[in-house]
Each structure stands twice: as C-alpha cells, then as structure tokens.
From Swiss-Prot:
Record family assignment: Belongs to the UPF0754 family.
Keywords of this entry: Cell membrane, Membrane, Transmembrane, Transmembrane helix
Native source organism of the sequence: Staphylococcus epidermidis (strain ATCC 35984 / DSM 28319 / BCRC 17069 / CCUG 31568 / BM 3577 / RP62A)
Lipid bilayer topology: Multi-pass membrane protein
Record-annotated membrane-spanning stretches: 4-24, 356-376
Name this protein carries in UniProt: UPF0754 membrane protein SERP1382
InterPro entries: DUF445, UCP032178
Amino acid sequence: MHTILLVVFMIILGAIIGGVTNMIAIKMLFHPFKPYYIFRFRIPFTPGLIPKRREEIARKIGQVIEEHLITEELIRQKLNQPQSRNMIQQLIHKQISKLKNDDVTIKKIAGFLGIDVNELVDYKLTTKFLNKLNFWYESNKYRKLSEILPQSFLDQCKGQIEYITDFLCERARNYLSSEKGERDIYELLDTFFNEKGRIIGLLQMFMTKESIADRIQHELIRLTQHPQSQKIITKVLNDEYETFKDKNLDEIIKEQQFKNYSQLVLNELKTYLNLKDKTERPIKQVVPQFIQFLEDDTSKRMTDFIIKGTSKHLTNIMKKINLRQLVEEQINTFDLKYIENLIIDIANKELKLIMTLGFILGGIIGFFQGVIAIFV
C-alpha cells in the first residue's frame, strides 16, 4: 500500500510540476509587460517575450503583408480583372447618369470656355465656333490645368476626394469580407508558408493557417476603417490630384481629340436654330445624344485611362502609402493586453493542449520516478 501511495504521489507531483511549468512558460510570453529592476540590475525574463520583441514582430508582420500579401503585382492583377473594370465603368456610368439629372446648360459650358453664346448668333456659327475653340486650345495647351480652370471648380473637385476615399475603403472592405477575398488571403498565406518552410512551420504549433488567415482578414478590414488609413489614402489622392492639376492641357487631351469633341458639340448646336433658347435649356433636354455618347464611348476610354494611369503610378502610390510602416505603426499602437488576448483567442486550443501535455508528461515522469524510488 505504501508503494502504491508513493507512486501515486510522485505522479501527482510530477503532473503538477509539468503543468504549472508550461503554464508559467506561456504566461512568460506576455508577462510582465515592463522590465523590473533590483537596484540597477534588470530581473531576467522581464519584460515578457512578446512585449520585448513587440517592435520586431510589428516590423516583420508589416514586411510580410507588404512583400507577400498586398503586393503591387496583386493590385495590378486585380485592377485588370473584368470585375474591377466593370466596377469602375459602372461608377463612371453612375456619374454620367447624375449628369442627366443636373441642370447644366450649354450656355454655362460655353461661358466657362470664354464664349459669348449670343454673339454666335450674329456670326457664321461653324467658323466662329470652331475658330474660337481652336484658338482657346492653342492659347492654353501649354498652360497648367490649375491655371485654366476656375478656382471654385478646382475646390469642388478637391472636395470630392474624401468621397472617393470612402468609396475605395468600402470596396476594399467588401472585397476582404467576401468569400473570394477570404479565399485569396488563405491562398497567399498558404503560398507564403510553403515558401518559408520549417521556420514558419513553428508558428503552426500555436495556430492554424485558417485562424491566421481569419485574423489577417479581420485586421485588414479593421485597417480600412481606421482613420489613419483613410487619412493616408486621402493624402495620396490629394497628391495625385495636385499632380494632375499641374499637367498641361495638351498632356490631358490631344489636339485631334479636342477638335473631334469641338465638332461634335458644333453639330449638336447646329441642330437647333433657336440657339439662345436651346443653350439655356439643360443638356439632358437639348443634346441627349451627347449624354449617350458619354455613356457608350467616353466611359470606356475613361475606364482604360484610370486603370492604365493607376497601374503606371502604382509604385509611387505604394511608396507614398508605405504599407509596411502603416501596419508597423498600427500594431505598435495596440495595447499589450489586447495583443495577449488576440493571440490567446487565436491559439486558445493549442495553448490549452500544451498545458495539458505538460501535466501528462509530468505525470509520466513522476510515475517513473516513483518506480525508481521503490527500488532504490
């Protein structure tokens, strides 16, 4: 009886030691959050591993996301996919549809170009109109757009940038929240794990690829909602808008294109003999064919222009956004307690398994110690 009690006692003692040791080891990953000192000497293992390596972890995560998850090539591929093209074209169609409901008149457009519509009635319409437009283009083609357009119009365009930022963030959230976005993140993560081999395989001791992909998805979605992200996107759009304003007119529209559009407007004006009356009526009533032209032809060209322009300047855009630094700064702002809860939430089952394994191994070792103690 004494022998059995000895073995049982050693098993219980070994299990307690093994389990508690693993529990302490897990706790030491996170705690303490700050270093402790005795006199001038720092107590070993303070702070915990994750608080101590926090900046390095943030830097590595930012590097992984920038180099392997959200890359320039991936964004270019997404931009050139039919779904993205259709989405952009639908947005342009939506804006053209709004034009149908606006009370923009030819008189306002002509006045914007410096043309007195009433004076056109007294001159040969064709010669006067085309000559005036061509003269205006020749006079302004080497001027910057910001020097040509009224300041009120430029301010109105600039005011739309925040709406574009909200739209981009919303589309990003919709994509990341979709099944396709979830699948793409998992596939990228799976490719990354396969490329990195054993080192990354150690991470799977604490969490599965599914849980990591799920967490990345949630954090990326949260990132699109973060004010700092929206602020950076708005800044990039503002910078690109300022660059666009500084382009010369002939960089935006070529001479032949300008002549084609001028001729189109002229043909529509010649359709109406009562020019003064017609120019004061909304475009949607006067020249519905022009709206149709915008819908059928211009929207496609604008879509191609947006996609090609974005792809061309994507490197500069990514540099200005600095995704790696953005992620690193965001992670460094997280409260350590939040990071602890986040990791425990992801790897809860695995951590419990490690603690259970400590109890089991400790019990087994205690059993053999008890057996050895009997014969010693």
